[in-house]
Design a protein with these regions (language model features):
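Divalent metal-binding pocket/active-site signature
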Residues: 1-55, 67, 75-80, 98-107, ...
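Hydrophobic faces of well-ordered beta-strands that scaffold small-molecule active sites
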Residues: 6-8, 37-40, 60-62, 85-89
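Generic structural signal for secondary-structure transition and capping sites
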Residues: 26, 57-58, 82-85, 144
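Short, acidic/turn-prone active-site loops that include or flank metal/cofactor-
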Residues: 43, 64-68, 91-93
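Conserved catalytic/ligand-binding micro-motifs in nucleotide and anionic cofactor chemistry
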Residues: 71
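Glycine/small-residue-rich hydrophobic helix-like segments
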Residues: 79-91, 96
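Crotonase-superfamily enoyl-CoA hydratase/isomerase domain that binds
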Residues: 97-99, 113-114
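Mid-to-C-terminal alpha-helical segments outside catalytic/metal-binding sites
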Residues: 107-158
Length: 158
């Protein structure tokens, strides 16, 4: 096996996806394997989050929907643990406020980070640190490896 995480993109089929993930997680465990991955563009309710959280080692990709004024995702994010989140875009779609209606790009990640921080009552730096740790863990990056480039904080551009 390659022991790689999966990226799951589901629309309007979360109940079916929950059943599938539960079945596949059980099958993987029976073989001594670990099913893990990311639920891309997650924008569901807290009940769906809790159900999927029990299914295995999955992260929840939070993107440009969270800043939308009528997004139910804001209520869900308040209940989610930072250790379960990664920041993402759905480029070129789901552009966060204040750029909604324009082409999405990774440069808008700070808006998502800031909104999550506000919802969680923490700092953008803490959200950025937690979601970076989560991504490094999920994708097997060596946490001790440091780049030689001086990268700015994801919140500095705002």
């Amino acid at each position: 096996t390659y022991d790689l995480p999966v990226a799951i993109h589901t629309r309007a089929a979360w109940k079916d996806m929950c059943r599938t993930v539960e079945t596949e997680t059980k099958a993987a465990r029976e073989k001594g394997l670990r099913l893990r991955g990311v639920f891309h563009a997650f924008a569901e309710d807290a009940d769906t989050y809790r159900q999927l959280k029990e299914c295995g080692d999955f992260l929840f990709g939070i993107g440009g929907v969270v800043p939308f004024k009528k997004s139910r995702l804001a209520d869900t994010v308040r209940e989610m643990e930072l250790d379960d989140l990664v920041l993402e875009t759905d480029c070129p779609y789901l552009t966060p406020v204040p750029y909604r209606g324009q082409r999405n790009e990774s440069g808008y990640i700070p808006y998502i980070c800031n909104k999550i921080a506000a919802l969680k009552g923490t700092t953008p730096e803490e959200v950025a640190a937690a979601t970076t740790r989560n991504a490094r863990r999920m994708f097997g990056f060596d946490a001790a490896r440091q780049t030689t480039n001086d990268h700015s904080s994801p919140t500095e551009s705002i």
